[in-house]
Amino acid sequence: MVWNNLFTNLALLHGLFLPMAIAVLASRICDMEHKGDTWKLLGTAAEPMNRLYLSKFLCAFLILTFTLTVELAVLIVFGIWKGFPVPIPTDLVLPIYFGTLLASVFVLALQQWVSMAVSNQLVALIVGMAGAFLGFVGALFPAQVRIVFPWCAYADLSCVQTVPLGEHEWAYIAISPICFHRYWCVLWECLYISWGNATCAEKNFRRGRSC
């Protein structure tokens, strides 16, 4: 029960903070090319331009995966230090970790495309702020609305659900993650990765222009 409570709160925090953090990460990786106007220089490299999006995406993905792994390890160590009951519920830990990573990869694919397509990085940050809002309140939306906004997958892919018991009492129960949202996130990820590659392949190298 204590572990369930911890992971439920973690899912809520992920929905609020991860979209914004990913927006900043993707923006920083792409903004150096916008400020230095080095898109044309990158276009002279031996590698085709459609791999530029994928290479930057992989760099951000590795940073994101490392961050989520360290976060999970710190939470487990914290729980053991605080005397949480053992054994650790690995049947919850792994689905929550991979569910969070899956939802984050979608957000990263979208933010990477926006950051490369628009030179003004304020636009990318606004998209990240909107995603943070949807990720935080998405659990309150009906299921028909949540599937439209994959940011809401942070709550759906967490394996813990809050159930009201009374006026001021709540219980946390373990559930199976919603497989439909997994497939939906994968579909969005493939769409934006393909879109980003295609956009960079047709890149215009005029000064001040991006993908």
Task: Describe the role of every protein-language-model region.
Residues 1-5, 125, 130-208:
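Terminal transmembrane helical anchor/hairpin motif
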Residues 29-43, 105-133:
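Cytoplasmic juxtamembrane interface segments
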Residues 31-34, 38, 74, 78-86, ...:
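Membrane-interfacial segments
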Residues 19, 23, 27, 32, ...:
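Alpha-helical transmembrane segments
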Residues 27-61:
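Helix-loop-helix units of permease transmembrane domains in multi-pass membrane transporters
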Residues 22-26, 74, 110-111, 150, ...:
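Hydrophobic/aromatic residues in alpha-helical transmembrane segments
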Residues 1-21, 54-119, 136, 169-180:
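Secretory targeting signals
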